[in-house]
Design a protein with these regions (language model features):
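Short low-complexity stretches enriched in small and charged residues
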Residues: 5-9, 36, 237-246, 283
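Proline-rich low-complexity regions
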Residues: 19, 25-28, 197, 224, ...
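Generic, low-specificity signal for short hydrophobic/alpha-helical stretches with a mild N-terminal bias
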Residues: 19-22, 136-140, 213, 264, ...
């Protein structure tokens, strides 16, 4: 497919993916071994990429992707695509058939438009991403394409798509790993250091281990699983259908199952996380566990914009935003959402707003994490990974702190010093 300018936009459904999308655009979320954005760019192969997202994310998004954000710098014809679209073979075929001046909707939601340079500039500048507005730019037709609507769908889709890692890297040739199944299904990017004994089970799917990873003894990994660059896995049990981003540390006694762990996150100690999506720069304290099954074996419900939504899933864990910290012994109930920059203690049986110190099960009222503490904690964690905190990082924290103040107030989060009696 030949595309001159590709514009990926996020729509108002970004709120469905909170707390993950407080700090990321919707199309930056993981789906398989890549983000939705990476999948779109790889499939459509455009000459130029433009992104449209919430204004407060602009600088960080430009830095992470290298693409122009919220500017209509269109060159030639433009394909404008909803960032929640998973571009598989069906979607690619439909997009390939799209004619200039046409727009596609699915269930009344704009999926894509193909416009000439002038109209595309106007559509992007004015954020014409609703069907009723798109009609002034293009003829609209309905198609049967699924947009990702809720965060738990990313977990399910990732488990289905991880088979794609069989085409990554090269076959592992060392003898330190006991491979159960075809050796061709254990893939690496090279420079993997293994301290045996390690078992990798690829009978249900491939396993990919990124560059410069360390896999220490008594680790077991089941496929399909993706492990990003520069990770350290120390005696952990990584069950099937897991995604682990770059520079993560997963330690002795850790058990992961069907879970997305984003980059720079630490889970060094004993504890279980299953059927969950965990953001970047999260530190998970020893003994932290996530429930992914109700005692009744009923389906898990998740609070979306103030209403309970039945996920239809019997097994579902939690959704953890970026920069969350859990103390030792934290226990998180199924279906809960943890806002970015929050600190958790004890049992977490309610959703936690951003910038909140939570210890209700210890008899303490939730307290607002001070802005200065959030900034300094980020700086310290970055420093431990050899990463420099930037002005953009600090400005995002400040802006997000302001944007989420009302949410904390409605949830009864108080200002003041946190202390346990």
């Amino acid at each position: 497919m030949s595309v001159t300018t590709l514009c990926i936009f996020e729509d108002e459904y970004c709120e469905n993916f909170l707390p993950l999308t407080y700090t990321k655009a919707t199309f930056e979320l993981i789906c398989g071994s890549k983000t939705l954005l990476e999948r779109a760019v790889e499939a459509l192969k455009p000459q130029k990429v433009l992104l449209v997202a919430r204004d407060y994310l602009r600088e960080g998004l430009e830095g992470r992707t290298g693409f122009v954000v919220n500017e209509a710098e269109v060159e030639g014809d433009a394909l404008i695509v909803n960032g929640r679209l998973l571009i598989d073979s069906q979607a690619l075929a439909i997009l390939d058939s799209l004619k200039l001046g046409e727009a596609l909707t699915s269930k009344g939601i704009l999926v894509a438009m193909k416009l000439g340079e002038g109209l595309a500039r106007g559509a992007i500048t004015n954020r014409v991403f609703e069907p009723r507005l798109a009609k002034s730019f293009a003829s609209v037709k309905e198609v049967d394409l699924e947009l990702v609507e809720y965060p738990w769908q990313l977990i399910e889709l990732t488990s289905e798509l991880l088979g794609e890692v069989s085409s990554l890297g090269e076959r592992y040739e060392g003898d330190e790993i006991k491979v159960l199944g075809s050796p061709d299904m254990l893939r690496t990017a090279g420079d993997v250091r293994v301290e045996g004994p390690v078992v990798v089970d690829v009978r249900r799917g491939p396993v990919y281990i990124g560059r410069d990873c360390e896999i220490e003894g008594y680790t077991k990994i089941e496929g399909p699983t993706y492990i990003g660059d520069s990770c350290v896995i120390r005696g952990a049990y990584i069950r099937s259908k897991c995604y682990i981003g770059k520079v993560c540390r997963i330690g002795v006694g850790s058990e992961l199952e069907k879970t997305i762990i984003s980059g720079y996150t630490n889970k060094q100690h004993l504890g279980f996380i299953g059927h969950s999506y965990v953001g970047e720069w999260v530190n998970i304290g020893a003994g932290t566990n996530v429930s992914d099954l109700k005692n009744t074996y009923g389906t898990v419900k998740v609070n979306i914009k103030g209403s309970k939504v039945d996920t239809g899933l019997i097994k579902l864990g939690c959704f953890v935003g970026d920069h969350v910290k859990t103390s030792i012994g934290t226990q998180i109930y199924s279906g809960k959402k943890i806002g970015p920059f929050s600190h958790l203690h004890g049992f977490v049986y309610e959703d936690v707003p951003p910038f909140t110190i939570w210890a209700k099960s210890f008899g303490a009222e939730p307290v607002e994490l001070e802005l200065e503490s959030a900034v300094e904690t980020q700086r310290r964690m970055y420093e431990r990974r050899g990463v420099s905190q930037t002005k953009t990082d600090v400005e995002l924290i400040k802006r997000l702190f302001e944007l989420t103040a009302e949410e904390r107030a409605k949830s009864g989060v108080k200002k003041g010093r946190f202390k346990l009696a």
